[in-house]
UniProtKB/Swiss-Prot annotation:
UniProt GO molecular function: ATP binding; ATP hydrolysis activity; guanyl-nucleotide exchange factor activity; identical protein binding; metal ion binding; protein folding chaperone; unfolded protein binding
Protein name: ATPase GET3
Pfam families for this protein: ArsA_ATPase
UniProt-annotated binding residues for Zn(2+): 280, 283
InterPro entries the UniProt entry points to: Anion-transp_ATPase-like_dom, ATPase_ArsA/GET3, ATPase_ArsA/GET3_euk, P-loop_NTPase
Annotated gene: GET3
Length: 349
């Protein structure tokens, strides 16, 4: 416990020069995409000489909707920003790419795609529960490998717009789960090597070698994910019971994974006391409820950076609106002085 109250902003993260991986997650419908876009924009504006990549790992992609432009499975620059790119992982397309790459390379690729080289393993892969998370994890592995080899565009920091909590936890469990599976599988792989190679669809594929290669990559990612200087998780919630409950569960799980988590974004706050023009009883009642849970958040997470974001009447879409809204991550929102800006966002001005 520290005697210093953490700043009610993400300024330290936005200006961080060490973080390589930033995960943004929480319960469905709490504003994860808007928050991840806002973090990515603010980091790109604060550090114009660095390159940032925003990846959506949510099967229901929203980055294209948020920026009002189409993104796909390949990283593409956000129109109007020279150092921010976006991509949306499509599980079915990614799986096809993996199989095509493995077959074309004849096994000369990363460990996981090598194991999927045609045959029965490839047929089974598409129906495996959690394949979306596995393919997202593969993108991380691919990114690390490219950075090490100097291939493709270099990104200093990758921000993940994650799926709802359950999917995200499965994704973050993958390094530990894969390590355990590979350890157990490796114990018998020596005796079953030829059989495994045949099962993979190509007797020339060294399954045991691919497994060891995969294990090394997974351990490297796990080490980075548990380094607080390299990786952090930003929780997003709204000031309601179910969201607060799920946020606490998420934080406890992250702590059990040894992942750094010290920031919470609370979205959709009414700040009704400052709305002098409209005396809305329903708004006042809801704000009273929000304040109750806000006080619990402040008490439970007194050593966290807690950022309180206002509710806008309309959706926050397009780069310019996202820029305006995201500034409240850097400078605490003041309903007395910043209310006009929120009104402009509501009107789409």
């Amino acid at each position: 416990m520290t005697d210093i109250t953490p700043e009610a902003s993400l300024r330290s993260l936005i200006n961080s020069t060490t973080h390589k991986w930033i995960f943004v997650g929480g319960k469905g419908g709490v504003g994860k995409t808007t928050s991840s876009c806002s973090i990515a924009i603010q980091m790109a504006l604060a550090q114009p000489t660095k390159q940032f990549l925003l990846i959506s790992t949510d099967p229901a992609h929203n980055l294209s909707d948020a920026f009002n432009e189409k993104f796909g499975k390949d990283a593409r620059k956000v129109t109007g920003m020279d150092n921010l790119s976006c991509m949306e992982i499509d599980p079915s397309a990614a799986l096809k790419d993996v199989n095509d790459m493995a077959i074309a390379n004849g096994g000369d690729d990363d460990g996981l795609s090598g194991l999927l080289q045609g045959g029965a393993l490839a047929d089974l892969t598409g129906s495996i529960p959690g394949i979306d998370e596995a393919l997202s994890f593969m993108e991380v592995m691919k990114h690390i490998k490219k950075q090490e080899q100097g291939d493709g565009e270099h990104f200093d920091t990758v921000i993940f717009d994650t799926a709802p909590t359950g999917h995200t936890l499965r994704f973050l469990q993958l390094p530990t789960t894969l390590t355990k599976v590979l350890d157990k599988f490796g114990a018998i792989a020596g005796r079953l090597g030829p059989m495994l190679n045949s099962f993979a669809g190509n007797p020339n594929v060294d399954v045991l070698g691919k497994m060891n290669e995969l294990k090394e990559s997974v351990q490297k990612i796990k080490k980075q994910f548990t380094d607080p200087d390299l990786t952090t998780f930003v929780c997003v919630c709204i000031s309601e019971f179910l969201s607060l409950y799920e946020t606490e569960r998420l934080i406890q799980e992250l702590i059990s994974y040894d992942m750094d988590v010290n920031s919470i974004i609370v979205n959709q706050l009414l700040f009704a006391e400052s709305d002098k023009e409209h005396n809305c009883k329903r708004c006042q009642a809801r704000w009273k409820m929000q304040k109750k849970y806000l006080s619990q958040i402040d008490e439970l997470y007194e050593d966290f950076h807690i950022v309180k974001m206002p509710l806008c009447a309309g959706e926050i879409r397009g780069l310019e609106n996202l820029k305006k809204f995201s500034c409240f991550l850097n400078n605490k929102y003041d309903p007395e002085t910043d209310g006009e800006l929120v009104y402009q966002l509501e009107q789409g001005l």
